[in-house]
Design a protein with these regions (language model features):
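A short helix-loop-beta-strand connector motif used in the catalytic cores of GNAT acetyltransferases and
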Residues: 46-59, 91
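Conserved GNAT-fold acetyl-CoA-binding loop/helix
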Residues: 21-47
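A short, internal acetyl-CoA/4′-phosphopantetheine-binding micro-motif in the GNAT/acyltransferase core
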Residues: 95-102
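Conserved active-site alpha-helix within GNAT-family acetyltransferase domains
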Residues: 108, 112, 120, 132-151, ...
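Conserved GNAT acetyl-CoA-binding A-motif
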Residues: 119-129
Length: 169
């Protein structure tokens, strides 16, 4: 990135739903999980902007002064609650920077923006998960000062397992 480029962060608007989905698919491709993306523009719009919206998306834009800013990164956050702390926290669901723009401070700006959101809302922390093979991301997070939460595993009920535990009537 040269000196003329500036990073700015802005919240997604309803007009950005297709772009948010594009970033989600880019992350899924990188994580070798493209087959798992079933999100649509319609359900994403509802999650981000509907009556019961439960997520927020933000873009990192790069502007060089010679045209419209270009979205080069995206982060999606949700609220999480901890009974142990008795507080909500900010959960980083996704963060993705386009490959050609990595290593230039864009991911750091997105996480710093999230940290600012957490602080402004009175949340004591921001948390997220990372695939265990994603060493570049792990190194990046640890360089920022994030700590691995030892002793915890993530579990998920979905599909048939979700149906078996609570059969539809």
């Amino acid at each position: 990135m040269n000196d003329k480029n500036e990073i700015s962060i802005r919240q997604a608007t309803p007009d950005d739903v297709a772009l948010v989905l594009q970033f989600i698919k880019g992350l899924a491709d990188y994580e070798k999980l493209a087959d798992e993306v079933v999100a649509t523009q319609a359900n994403l719009a509802e999650s981000l902007f509907g009556t019961n919206a439960n997520a927020e998306a933000f873009f990192a834009h790069l502007s060089s002064g010679d045209g419209e800013p270009v979205a080069v990164g995206c982060a999606i956050f949700t609220q999480h609650y901890s009974t142990y702390s008795g507080n909500s926290s900010l959960y980083l669901e996704d963060v993705f920077v386009l490959p050609e723009w990595r290593g230039q401070g864009i991911g750091r700006e997105l996480l710093a923006y999230g940290a600012g959101l957490a602080k402004s809302r009175g949340y004591p922390r921001m948390e997220w998960s990372v695939l265990d093979w994603n060493e570049p991301a792990i190194g990046f997070y640890e360089k920022l000062g994030a700590e691995r939460v030892e002793g915890w595993l993530t579990y998920r009920l979905s599909g048939d397992a979700l149906e078996r535990i609570n059969p539809s009537s």
